[in-house]
């Protein structure tokens, strides 16, 4: 049996990125820790980017992040929550329903009454039907939550107009070869 290279499980080096018993998935361990580590989205988080200005001015609004798989929607939402001091509540529209939303809304309302804000991140938000999407309206309008919805589908076709009118839509770039090369070097 061949010996794995150093840094790989069984290679004698603990803490390697590819270690079999590592506590978190590789993608999670490599996830950017702050906005300076995010690649390919300078139009949003660069010095003149819309999201950068929102964060710098502490004027965060509800938004929809639209982009292909792997472009950084979830990572960006986590970093926005950390940078804004809001409690991050992640949900997947694939695995969640109205009951899950109500629980999050109740926790967010309790936090709000205590002076703490909540950022609700909904992955695959386009998977919620129109009635479920309407459930966000009162809590977005009254400031109970800041909503960040992530979608790979065109929000103009997949999200209802009432929700879209209360959110800014940001388009995330696909990571091209040059960007991926830059990330590796």
Language model regions located:
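Short loop/turn elements that form and flank the Walker-type P-loop nucleotide-binding site
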Residues: 31-32, 45, 58-61, 71, ...
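Conserved AAA+ ATPase core "coupling" helix
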Residues: 159-185
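Conserved beta-strand position immediately N-terminal to the Walker
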Residues: 36, 63, 170
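Walker A/P-loop
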Residues: 2-6, 10-19, 53-91, 106-109, ...
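Flexible beta-alpha connector loops of hexameric P-loop NTPases
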Residues: 88-99, 146-148, 169-178
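Dynamic helix-loop-helix/coil hinge segments at AAA+ ATPase domain boundaries and subdomain interfaces
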Residues: 22-47, 90
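Conserved catalytic/switch belt of AAA+ P-loop NTPases
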Residues: 52-56, 122, 126-155, 161-165
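Short glycine-rich substrate-engagement loop in P-loop NTPases that contacts/grips substrate
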Residues: 44-49, 86-119, 130
């Amino acid at each position: 049996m061949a010996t794995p290279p150093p840094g790989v499980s069984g290679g004698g080096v603990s803490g390697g990125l590819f270690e079999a018993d590592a506590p978190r998935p590789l993608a999670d361990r490599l996830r950017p820790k702050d906005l300076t580590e995010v690649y390919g989205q300078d139009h949003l988080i660069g010095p003149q980017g819309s999201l950068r200005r929102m964060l710098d001015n502490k004027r965060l609004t509800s938004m929809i992040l639209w982009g292909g798989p792997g472009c950084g929607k979830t990572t960006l939402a986590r970093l926005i929550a950390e940078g804004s001091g809001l409690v991050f509540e992640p949900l997947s529209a694939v695995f969640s329903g109205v009951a899950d939303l109500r629980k999050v809304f109740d926790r967010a309302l309790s936090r709000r009454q205590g002076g703490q804000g909540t950022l609700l991140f909904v992955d695959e938000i386009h998977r919620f039907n129109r009635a479920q999407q309407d459930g966000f309206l009162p809590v977005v309008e009254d400031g109970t939550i800041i909503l960040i919805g992530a979608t790979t589908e065109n929000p103009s076709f997949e999200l209802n107009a009432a929700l879209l009118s209360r959110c800014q839509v940001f388009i995330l770039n696909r990571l091209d070869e040059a960007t991926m090369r830059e990330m590796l070097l």
